[in-house]
Amino acid sequence: MSEAEASVVATAAPAATVPATAAGVVAVVVPVPAGEPQKAGGGAGGGGGAASGPAAGTPLHAPGPRTPGNQATAASGTPAPPARSQADKPVLAIQVLGTVKWFNVRNGYGFINRNDTKEDVFVHQTAIKRNNPRKFLRSVGDGETVEFDVVEGEKGARAANVTGPGGVPVKGSRYAPNRRRFRRFIPRPRPAAPPPMVAEAPSGGTEPGSEGERAEDSGQRPRRRRPPPFFYRRRFVRGPRPPNQQQPIEGSDGVEPKETAPLEGDQQQGDERVPPPRFRPRYRRPFRPRPPQQPTTEGGDGETKPSQGPTDGSRPEPQRPRNRPYFQRRRQQPPGPRQPIAAETSAPINSGDPPTTILE
């Protein structure tokens, strides 16, 4: 039987699929007619049939893409090891001492110079194992001696497990911020305190009138005011007056106290919802009594006039005008020496004319 006939038989006969093995290889069994010797070429043909099975449309579950490592493990029959993580990097040296060449706190990386090989090793802030407890950020100081492990990185040697000499915490950079000594206090709004409740008296001795009086007393109780700050107290500021001091001031302005009394009662009956308005009285000059009137009056030219009416006190003397000029006051003279002058004018003249009285 030639190779061509064997391939035709392989495609025509139903192929039995075998589940994949642990190595991911699929085996196909092809029936061979009895009485015919199996040749080496037939084995190859069987292999060819296995290869042509998927192409002919046989439903085979082909494994995923193979890697070079998987091909080697398929031949050996052992599972492939998982991919190596970043933490399992090969360690080149452990507990190596070095001096920090420079470290940037803002960017979080720098370089350490090894003391044994004088080689610069990259260090990141995440590689610092024991940081200064007083520092807020992880860092190492410039020129500081540190102890670290050297591992293989993507671009070269890299430091890991960075501590101080002997495993102590590192000092840190002087540019790294320090931690706050105390926790920041955040004030929280407190709920308003409920009004003080009046203690309930025993039910046996209560009276209906006493409860109403207690309710009025609780409503009239003044609220406590917080004192002003120290710098505000030193100023002489006139604050609002209590209601008991405003009552006499309002009565002095001409308002009767009878009208103000019911208003204050209404305000007290309310729950002090609206504070009393501030009232500042207008300044008024105090009353000064005027001096008594002079018995004589003066004319426009400063001369005296005798009284036209009787002086027995039955009729009051005329008052002097209010719009009198100021300079006339200086010409005013006492009435004592003027009486003989008036008598001389009223004396009879030696001439034969009858006596006359000078009147203006």
Curated annotation (Swiss-Prot):
<feature type="compositionally biased region" description="Basic residues">
    <location>
        <begin position="279"/>
        <end position="288"/>
    </location>
</feature>
<feature type="modified residue" description="Phosphothreonine">
    <location>
        <position position="67"/>
    </location>
</feature>
<dbReference type="GO" id="GO:0007286">
    <property type="term" value="P:spermatid development"/>
</dbReference>
<feature type="modified residue" description="Phosphoserine">
    <location>
        <position position="252"/>
    </location>
</feature>
<feature type="compositionally biased region" description="Basic residues">
    <location>
        <begin position="221"/>
        <end position="238"/>
    </location>
</feature>
<dbReference type="GO" id="GO:0048477">
    <property type="term" value="P:oogenesis"/>
</dbReference>
<feature type="region of interest" description="Disordered">
    <location>
        <begin position="159"/>
        <end position="360"/>
    </location>
</feature>
<dbReference type="GO" id="GO:0017148">
    <property type="term" value="P:negative regulation of translation"/>
</dbReference>
<dbReference type="GO" id="GO:0048255">
    <property type="term" value="P:mRNA stabilization"/>
</dbReference>
<dbReference type="GO" id="GO:0008289">
    <property type="term" value="F:lipid binding"/>
</dbReference>
<feature type="region of interest" description="Required for cytoplasmic retention">
    <location>
        <begin position="89"/>
        <end position="171"/>
    </location>
</feature>
<feature type="compositionally biased region" description="Low complexity">
    <location>
        <begin position="198"/>
        <end position="209"/>
    </location>
</feature>
<dbReference type="InterPro" id="IPR012340">
    <property type="entry name" value="NA-bd_OB-fold"/>
</dbReference>
<feature type="domain" description="CSD">
    <location>
        <begin position="95"/>
        <end position="165"/>
    </location>
</feature>
<dbReference type="GO" id="GO:0003729">
    <property type="term" value="F:mRNA binding"/>
</dbReference>
<dbReference type="InterPro" id="IPR019844">
    <property type="entry name" value="CSD_CS"/>
</dbReference>
<dbReference type="GO" id="GO:0005737">
    <property type="term" value="C:cytoplasm"/>
</dbReference>
<feature type="compositionally biased region" description="Basic residues">
    <location>
        <begin position="321"/>
        <end position="332"/>
    </location>
</feature>
<dbReference type="Pfam" id="PF00313">
    <property type="entry name" value="CSD"/>
</dbReference>
<dbReference type="GO" id="GO:0120162">
    <property type="term" value="P:positive regulation of cold-induced thermogenesis"/>
</dbReference>
<feature type="region of interest" description="Required for mRNA-binding">
    <location>
        <begin position="219"/>
        <end position="360"/>
    </location>
</feature>
<dbReference type="InterPro" id="IPR002059">
    <property type="entry name" value="CSP_DNA-bd"/>
</dbReference>
<dbReference type="GO" id="GO:1990904">
    <property type="term" value="C:ribonucleoprotein complex"/>
</dbReference>
<dbReference type="GO" id="GO:0003682">
    <property type="term" value="F:chromatin binding"/>
</dbReference>
<dbReference type="GO" id="GO:0003677">
    <property type="term" value="F:DNA binding"/>
</dbReference>
<feature type="compositionally biased region" description="Gly residues">
    <location>
        <begin position="40"/>
        <end position="51"/>
    </location>
</feature>
<dbReference type="InterPro" id="IPR011129">
    <property type="entry name" value="CSD"/>
</dbReference>
<keyword id="KW-0597">Phosphoprotein</keyword>
<feature type="region of interest" description="Disordered">
    <location>
        <begin position="34"/>
        <end position="87"/>
    </location>
</feature>
<dbReference type="GO" id="GO:0005634">
    <property type="term" value="C:nucleus"/>
</dbReference>
<keyword id="KW-0539">Nucleus</keyword>
<feature type="modified residue" description="Phosphothreonine">
    <location>
        <position position="78"/>
    </location>
</feature>
<comment type="subunit">
    <text>Found in a mRNP complex with PABPC1 and YBX3. Found in a mRNP complex with ZAR1 and ZAR1L.</text>
</comment>
<feature type="compositionally biased region" description="Pro residues">
    <location>
        <begin position="188"/>
        <end position="197"/>
    </location>
</feature>
<protein>
    <recommendedName>
        <fullName>Y-box-binding protein 2</fullName>
    </recommendedName>
</protein>
<dbReference type="InterPro" id="IPR050181">
    <property type="entry name" value="Cold_shock_domain"/>
</dbReference>
<dbReference type="GO" id="GO:0003730">
    <property type="term" value="F:mRNA 3'-UTR binding"/>
</dbReference>
<feature type="compositionally biased region" description="Basic residues">
    <location>
        <begin position="177"/>
        <end position="187"/>
    </location>
</feature>
<feature type="compositionally biased region" description="Basic and acidic residues">
    <location>
        <begin position="211"/>
        <end position="220"/>
    </location>
</feature>
<dbReference type="GO" id="GO:0045182">
    <property type="term" value="F:translation regulator activity"/>
</dbReference>
<dbReference type="GO" id="GO:0043021">
    <property type="term" value="F:ribonucleoprotein complex binding"/>
</dbReference>
<keyword id="KW-0694">RNA-binding</keyword>
